[in-house]
From Swiss-Prot:
Compositionally skewed regions (Basic and acidic residues) per UniProt: 90-107
The name this protein goes by in its record: Putative uncharacterized protein OBSCN-AS1
Positions of the UniProt region annotated as Disordered: 75-158
Originating gene: OBSCN-AS1
């Protein structure tokens, strides 16, 4: 958990480090703002690397939380386990019809799927597109506003 130090304590520390007294009120205000934001982020359950906390001096956010939280089109882990390993029966899930021989088709939740290892489509592990508010995606990501609209707007590459 984040434990905020008081503004008075900050001011005492700053005084020892010989900061001009004219800038003291601004430092106290900035510290109060950052402390409350950090506290809110830690109460929310995000670690320090996952916070989308505004830096009080640059007024920009430290990270794109929509990417980190996985809401930019990424699937849940259970969905990917079922997609990557369709040949392993899951008796705990309803709707399984077991196949007699490998290679027969089986029906799962109304979807027909062949047995045997099958690779997902290339790039399946990537989010389909970044969040609308995201300007700093993963390395090599080109945001929508640079490429325009359409199916290739947010692809990695040039």
């Amino acid at each position: 958990m984040y434990t905020a130090s008081s503004s008075a304590e900050t001011l005492r520390t700053v005084r020892r480090r010989s900061v001009p007294s004219s800038s003291m009120p601004y430092l106290a205000l900035a510290h109060n703002r950052v402390s409350s934001l950090n506290h809110a982020a830690s109460v929310d359950g995000w670690g320090t690397s996952h916070r989308n906390v505004a830096d009080s001096f640059s007024r920009t956010s430290r990270s794109c939380s929509r990417f980190l939280k996985g809401t930019a089109g990424s699937a849940r882990r259970e969905d990917w386990n079922g997609h990557l390993q369709p040949w392993i029966p899951r008796p705990d899930r309803r709707g399984w019809e077991t196949a007699d021989r490998k290679g027969e088709r089986t029906q799962v939740h109304g979807l027909r799927r062949s047995l045997g290892p099958r690779a997902p489509h290339p790039g399946a592990h990537r989010a389909l597109r970044p969040a609308q508010s995201c300007r700093s995606g993963p390395r090599g990501w080109t945001p929508c506003r640079c490429r325009g609209r359409g199916p290739t707007a947010c692809r990695r590459g040039s």
